């Protein structure tokens, strides 16, 4: 069941194009609105002050930094909305094929700086605010990061949306408007603590609540079959109803009118308040349904260790796709009557398996609500959807109990059985009598508890499946889904990830941005990163080398001040900044890093003063969150902080080594850390990281990688040259044999690592029993092969130290890295998706209003 609830005064036309009669009725309105808002300093100042007075209801006597930020944000939003309206109207009139990017996460970071830069209003806002007594950079700090994501998946989606708007592709993102982020991380006694991240505490000036866009989403209920001369028809009714309310966030393209949209859904009760229950004295029951409905979009990734947690996660996923598909279909129906046109006008990208139930939901709507036949409906579905796989880790490939889906989404489970039945007929035609193939490929995993394999459903229901790095895509084809690849080789592609250079160079590193513009003689590199290759022509120029070092030093000084303010630790900005920032997970091997730090500490302690004089000073920086239920990862955080406490208070090594764990890592913090990094750690066990995007951000900013040949590191090595990185460790092809050796106790622990273990066991870094499970996991299992890679890792770290002593050579390698990153721009990635998966074309908005672009 789906209903649009338009307000009377905002009723929409069938096509979205205003008819001449309406224009005549509102001729005064059209006469008044013939231009965009003015962007001179006086106009901007007036708009800011008007919002402070009329939107915030504050006076000029109560005009502090936060109200200045809010007033500025609302004034920028006004300008965004103008462009947004122009863009959507233009798309409606031209009717291009659109892509809808479905993602459970959008890790947007802060929006004020991004919007001002993209709309080319940096100087105007800087000067306007300066006259009002505010530095624009200070106001950026007033904004709280939108807590709509957790890690790389959400940040990738944000970069992609930026590129789609910049490249003028007609695209919308869809997701959920979480009231709380995953959690706000603190550190207490070295342990991670978690408190709710209520990021909306002061409101969100960037979103537009769309009370005229609501859809009803159903859960539970019953399915009844009604037979007629035309055949059987299935109706899903009763159950629990929840309202989906739309919230829009405009996404500006860079120096273009084109402004796309991210539409997020918030859950509200279908029936706001049970008055009968209240009047009957049942006060808790009166609000119970309201609370249950609102829980759906309360928290990003609720803990799914319990049945109720699993149910809530699946509710989130279905609520998300059900509302989204209602919206997509409504938009399609405004100007199209023939369902065969749907795949020619709509492309839907599934960002990982979370939105996969949308495959079945579209199928259900076509069959049950639109009356299409099975084959016709399924053909439309498979031509519409495409699926991006982001992992090869088995535990990350989602599966849901059949019993849960039968209870929560009974009609969908019926359809999944039917889809699987027809799919397995294809399998038997390819491999007659091969039960093993049927069992391995089936959407439903048999066993004591039957489960639906969401990745299998996504592959079966999509016309294209892509990995996110060359190595990852090969593993997807030959290791994760080899039988699917054998069945449908034409479905599988690689689309290496990318990041936006606008945020990660121009905004995060204005000094480097200025260098590029000066030495290239143009600022066009912001939208054509291939131009940056030209900087290599000047890499031997002493002036460029001096500027490069100056900018890096300034970024390191800024990070040192940040660390002092937020961590209370003094660090030397002249030291080598060694950075490891990402989600805390065993496969990402923060453990390998901290074990090497312990060895470095023990080595320095044993050195003579003469030997210490040769030591390269280091600041080792960690940041990242562990999932609340991931006990081992949280132990790793405890070990890092315990080691940091011992090292940082040891005056004997004070000038040679510091260790910092920066809590509550987010996009804004990354924008401070990344430009200041000298080396960055990309040390996952070979064959475990799908791609990674932090490696791309660091490389763009001239930070050298120490890492394994895993994920996108492989392609970075191809672009920058392996000689300009510090590569170590087992290769993917060697991992299985290495694990076999570990299982058979054929691995000797390096004496240096034995010394590290001994010091942990002796309590050098805290009570040994706290860290005993970590040591046991290494000695008796070591699935991620830290023991075998440890000596190779130390050798690579020694190479880092040696190169650092030759600063001229170091800077040249830094320049080569930064100048070789065109392939890792999200612009390149989006062009490939558009041409090879979605079949969409740019649609540059030609506005009737005067504009500066």
Curated annotation (Swiss-Prot):
This is Glycogen phosphorylase 1. It catalyses: [(1->4)-alpha-D-glucosyl](n) + phosphate = [(1->4)-alpha-D-glucosyl](n-1) + alpha-D-glucose 1-phosphate. GO terms for cellular component: cytoplasm. During logarithmic growth and early developmental phases, the activity of GP1 is dependent on 5'AMP. It then seems to convert to an AMP independent type. This alteration in activity coincides with phosphorylation of GP1. The modification N6-(pyridoxal phosphate)lysine is found at residue 697. One of its GO terms (molecular function) is nucleotide binding. Its EC number is 2.4.1.1. It comes from the Eukaryota. In D.discoideum glycogen phosphorylase exists as 2 developmentally regulated forms, GP1 and GP2, which are the products of separate genes. Belongs to the glycogen phosphorylase family. It comes from Dictyostelium discoideum (Social amoeba). SUPFAM superfamilies: UDP-Glycosyltransferase/glycogen phosphorylase (SSF53756). GO terms for biological process: glycogen catabolic process; response to cAMP. Keywords: Allosteric enzyme, Carbohydrate metabolism, Glycogen metabolism, Glycosyltransferase, Nucleotide-binding, Phosphoprotein, Pyridoxal phosphate, Transferase.
